[in-house]
Amino acid sequence: MKKIELHLHFDGSLSIPYASRLMGRDVTSELVSVHAKSLAEYLDKFTLPVRLLQSREDIETFASLLAKDLESDEVIYAEVRFCPLLHTGVLTADEVIEAALAGFRRVPEVKINLILCMMRNFSIEENKEVIRLAKKYRNQHVVAID
């Protein structure tokens, strides 16, 4: 059955096997929270994926793997959300977005658009940067901000 995925977190989609391969060890406990006692504890599980997805190659490769997973699940359209500013350890926010889009383009059978996320703990200027990026890429597969 063909499907549409409208709420998918890029960082939260990093698979345990892929993350473990990147880290060279089992990272299950760092990615899975069976009994999170608070939102902060739950969100802490995003720390490792964000840390692992800092290079153009890693972002692009993971984006293509995510697209392939969606395709195998018969998803024909997806809106993937993430905050590009979280991935700017060595890249610019533009490079982060372009890497994700390049990875998604490797699987043209799934139409994937981005929702750029602002963060509650970011400054007004940082969140304005997310808005600027959304405007810049609005005709290039960025469909919303959150």
Regions found by a protein language model. Give the residues of each.
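Metal-cofactor-binding active-site regions of metalloenzymes
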Residues: 1-146
